[in-house]
């Protein structure tokens, strides 16, 4: 691909993005969560700079957003927005443009560089519900030795774009969304700032989500947070597996290019926001399928009744507990309840609702063999609502399924067992904004 001039692939680094540990296991490895020198927007410009993650837009949507708000970080995160559509999204000049724009914005005062190593508190409020995390840098080695746990496979072709972006800009710009089991010591420090200190940013985005940021620079608080995280033995990637894998690969590439590295260099760490598990909100991730796989509705209902209790419903069905599903087709909603034996003897993955639906209905009845690649299935994030399921089933698709959300405990269980979540299992809201925090490497 040309971005690994010293033979990165020769190091066998693709093996770090899998289930195998690449560092010998050690006893009682503790998380290293470090404060960092942050590059961030000038206070009065933060609301204009902050942008949704690069991967929620297609090229045209990204271009329209940058035209609407020229300061949007998308112009750097998706630098192809600065070019005609004839220019390849992944052309070398696109990444070079991202680097130039970041440097230009720093020179012009759009971004400032803090002088001290700090942590930051990042609070997002959606529908009146706050979610408060800590912005910090996590360790490449913690990722490799599984202190930071994964629950998704990554595809190398999807990593290449972010590897090139980070390496060219020498900056990590999209934070990785991490989760940990709530800790009272960390909670108390964070709560004291939220309750008593003035935020450095406080704005509401056009989508109605409020964003507030506080800076933690007092040495005693910085030291206390650092020590508290050393008592936390497991941290989990909630969202951003490809960004995390890309940041790690750039770090390993830089290590190869700097054989005398000490481990203290910034490329050994990656930008993260860490949230306590009890503040996270996972929404349903719903399914819609193109046809009934050659069956009539009567045949289909009869066949699925072997494994599910099927009941007609009066209106929309939003499942209220694990093991239940909504189903909509031909203008009618149904309530499905998986029979108890479907969960017997299953591991953390097999007992997930998304697995039960796939293993006992989507696969054997509707013929969806691999949901990652099958063109007959589509996935609809819960943020779009149940009406979107009706709309799709009444137009380009045939049948839709509403899911009960995967719980954060289920996600932790899968990661702890070093298993992989099925595709499209979790939909996190609200989305972290890019451009508010930049970590230069």
PLM features: residue spans?
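Short hydrophobic alpha-helical segments enriched in small aliphatic residues
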Residues: 7-10
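Surface-exposed, charge/polar-rich loops and edge strands
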Residues: 27-441
């Amino acid at each position: 691909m040309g971005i690994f001039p010293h033979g990165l692939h020769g190091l066998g680094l693709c093996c770090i993005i899998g289930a195998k540990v690449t560092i010998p296991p050690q006893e009682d490895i503790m998380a290293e969560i470090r404060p960092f020198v942050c590059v961030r927007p000038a206070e009065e410009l933060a609301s204009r700079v902050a942008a949704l993650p690069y991967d929620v837009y297609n090229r045209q949507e990204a271009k329209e957003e940058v035209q609407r708000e020229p300061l949007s970080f998308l112009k750097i995160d998706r630098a192809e927005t600065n070019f005609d559509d004839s220019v390849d999204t992944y052309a070398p000049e696109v990444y070079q443009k991202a680097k130039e724009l970041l440097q230009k914005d720093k020179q012009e005062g759009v971004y400032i560089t803090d002088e001290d190593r700090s942590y930051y508190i990042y609070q997002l409020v959606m529908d009146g519900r706050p979610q408060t995390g800590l912005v910090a840098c996590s360790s490449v080695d913690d990722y490799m030795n599984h202190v930071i746990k994964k629950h998704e496979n990554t595809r190398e072709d999807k990593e290449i774009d972010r590897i090139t972006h980070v390496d060219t800009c020498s900056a990590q710009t999209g934070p990785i969304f991490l989760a940990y089991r709530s800790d009272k010591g960390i909670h108390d420090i964070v709560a004291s700032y939220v309750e008593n200190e003035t935020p450095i940013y406080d704005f509401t985005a056009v989508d109605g989500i409020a964003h507030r940021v506080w800076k933690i620079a007092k040495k005693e608080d910085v030291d206390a947070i650092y020590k508290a995280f050393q008592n936390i033995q497991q941290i989990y990637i909630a969202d951003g597996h490809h960004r995390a894998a890309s940041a790690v690969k750039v770090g390993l590439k830089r290590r190869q290019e700097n054989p005398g590295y000490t481990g203290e260099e910034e490329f050994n760490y990656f930008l993260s926001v860490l949230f306590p598990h009890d503040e996270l909100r996972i929404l349903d991730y719903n399914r819609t399928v193109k046809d009934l796989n050659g069956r009539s509705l009567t045949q289909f209902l009869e066949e699925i009744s072997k494994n599910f209790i099927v009941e007609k419903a009066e209106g929309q069905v939003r499942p209220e507990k694990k093991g239940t599903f909504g189903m909509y087709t031909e203008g009618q909603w149904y309530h499905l309840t998986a029979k108890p034996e479907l969960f017997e003897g299953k591991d953390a993955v097999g007992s997930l609702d998304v697995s039960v639906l796939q293993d006992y209905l989507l696969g054997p009845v509707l013929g969806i063999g691999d949901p990652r690649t099958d063109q007959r299935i589509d996935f609809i994030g819960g943020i779009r609502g149940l009406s979107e399921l009706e709309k799709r089933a009444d137009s380009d698709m045939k049948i839709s399924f509403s899911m009960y959300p995967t719980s954060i405990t289920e996600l932790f269980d899968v990661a702890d067992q070093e298993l992989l979540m099925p595709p499209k299992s979790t939909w996190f809201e609200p989305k972290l904004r890019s451009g508010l925090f930049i970590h230069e490497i």
